[in-house]
Amino acid sequence: CLYNQPLAVGRVMTPVLAMTVVREAAIAAFVPEKFYTVDLELTSGCTASSRRIPEKTVAENLLEACRKEMVATIQRITCKEKSENPPPLYDLTTLQRDANRLLGYSAQQTLDYVQSLYEKKLTTYPRTDSCYITDDDEEMLEELTEELEGFLDIAPEDVDEAVPRTRRTVNREKVTDHHAILPTRSMLQADLDALPKGEQNVLKLIIARTLMAVSKPFRYLETLLTTECAGEEFTAKGKDILEEGWKAVERKVLADILNRKQELTALPNAAENECGILNAELKEGQTSPPKHFTDVICYERGIRNRP
């Protein structure tokens, strides 16, 4: 123990301590391993990558062989339509997770921000473990989301017009004392620029999640291109958007809060049996150790393992 002081560990801290000790031991014992890949820039407009190769000389030999051939044979192209349903409304833990992942806030920071927003009557009660609302709240949420669409300037076609579109957020059995975290109607008239930056960011996450939860699914076409060169397989993946749905809200919020654009890689059509190779490059990588636990991860694991 730090400074050789005894530390009392109760029934709550014991599993957290055990979990942390196991993770730290795994990190301490981890030995990174280098690996190499060969990337081919194809005339079809995409980049295909080889498998991970542990030996550098093998990867270098493959690189030279590809540079000599300068042609890749298309073996197969598979396309599959996929769909991602919108995420549920926020409870405290999922809000803390996203604020940590996107903004670097600790669990306590996020709690402080959302507690302050609640005290200012800008959001509902924050200390909830439910991601749902009850039937009694459905009409309120329906009216609120209509106003939030204009607040975030969301295109109406991105939001689900199913009747009622809020039905997927309703589950009385999963609401205990308090429903999911929502913005309030009074938030729409508030001067949000006067809020501290941390509170502004957390509020934007809550507004965005509220709209995402009632938006259409994200539909896309996933394409996998498999080519062969010098006896080795190379693959490239891409996504073509069919319907952006809730991702439109996520994209807008990420651009606003993080000043970061979210882009998908679409594979161009490769109708020919062969593609020319414009460039072949050797890439070096290294395996990563398990990540250290943060307070947010501990909260998440505690919720997930709760009976």
Please report, for each region that a protein language model flagged, where it lies by residue.
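Polybasic, glycine- and aromatic-enriched phosphate-binding surface used to engage nucleic acids
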Residues: 232-264, 270
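Polar low-complexity intrinsically disordered regions enriched in Ser/Thr and small residues
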Residues: 48, 248, 276-279
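Phosphate-backbone binding and catalysis cores of DNA-processing enzymes
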Residues: 1-81, 175, 179-244
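Structured DNA-binding interfaces in DNA transaction proteins
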Residues: 60-200, 204, 210, 214, ...
